[in-house]
Amino acid sequence: MSASVPATASADPLTRYEAVVGVEVHCQLRTASKMFCACSTDHDGAAPNSHVCPVCLGLPGALPVINRRAVELVLMTGLAIDAATPAATRWDRKNYFYPDLPKGYQISQYDLPLASAGRLTVETGDGPVTIGITRAHLEEDTAKLVHATTPDGRKVSLVDYNRSGTPLMEIVTDPDIRTAEQARRYAEELQLLLRTIGASDADMERGQLRVEANVSLRPRGADAFGTRVEVKNMNSFRSVERAIDFEIVRQAAALDAGETLRMETRGWSDDRGETYHMRSKETSDDYRYFPDPDLPPLHVAADWLAGLRAEVPELPAARRARYEADLGLSPYDARVLAADPDATALFEATLAADPSMTAKAVANWVTGEYLRLRNVASPGAAVHVHAAELAAIIRSVEAGDISRANGKEVLAAHATSGAAAVDLIAERGFRQISDRTALAEAVDRVVAAHPAAVADYRAGKQQAVGFLVGQVMKATRGQANAAMVQETVRERLDAQP
């Protein structure tokens, strides 16, 4: 059938069918060198084929050496998802032929993964859902194909082997996911977990996190699985949800029309908003897995695993729960903070710098102004905020020494210059006038200079108060305490006959 969904397709096929979805995630591990050689993984922007050696080029006689840190990061991920760890594992060759695979096989793990039988609980619109994780295993990445056109118009495909051999972790769920939203939430939570434990930067835009989905439908109440279709090329979390939603509707329309679905791999087109046929789906038998004779089995000692367990930090779900239960934060603030490791670190450090401040006050500044500064910063620009300086700014605002608007300006200046908050406040003359006598004199001058506004107030126009307050703030170059100014203006207006 056509990739396009018929107009007659049911708007809600899940009333007749149950979707069965499994998600496979490949993430690039945060290591300095490749999986089986010493070549650097920092090849963004590097000249093609400049980070290569005989091992990652697959040259005859070159022997692989295991990257210990890559193994540790997968073991830590297994601990974070409450998975089982084997006493020993091994490496297998996954055989297939493609230009981006220099050896003609990929070193992976087949039946003895480093982690198995894990789980991850995610929050959805219908409440928490626990998704089983079948396995997490190590493998090496392929090279990158670059498709180009020569000056004389010929279509060519070029191979850049800089990426070849980069350590990857593949994480495969059980077929526990029932909606596209659940799949998206799972991918988002997994990205956060990987970043929190330091396993991966997991940046989808840079190809460090790749999500694939296996989607099938079965009639409501049936036990047997339907025909599985793999969906690739989903380059954002929104794409994950859109692609799975589309595939559910497409398969339902085909089944309703009496068609037989085929096992295939389909790509997702963000522009067209639909999936398209790529190739027939391979099975594990097609890859002819067998143990790699160049790599010995790997034994996971209990003391090694215990040391890695101590490295695993507080996980996002536990952190959200603590922020709500112990610090009294709203679910929104807890979620936003826990979703950003840098924001979490700044929040925690600022509270530690001044325990007298409320968690809510600090959360407001971190989730509001700090994240805003990060979002508006130019690409590659550094936004560094020191916890002690943020604490000083918050104290100054809450004490009424500076206005909140000026506090935001001080924070922005500190983030780019690193200057101390107290010096920035002094340089800019932001210290608020809170002396009641001085404020009263400024208010009296403004009230006397604007009799029309006074008359408007007498006539019941409350906006006149705002006008007069604004004039006082202008006259004091924004240094007056706005709350005290408003209070004094009302006192003066109400006291006049």
Give each language-model segment a name.
Residues 206-219, 287-288, 324-348, 359-376, ...:
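Core structural elements
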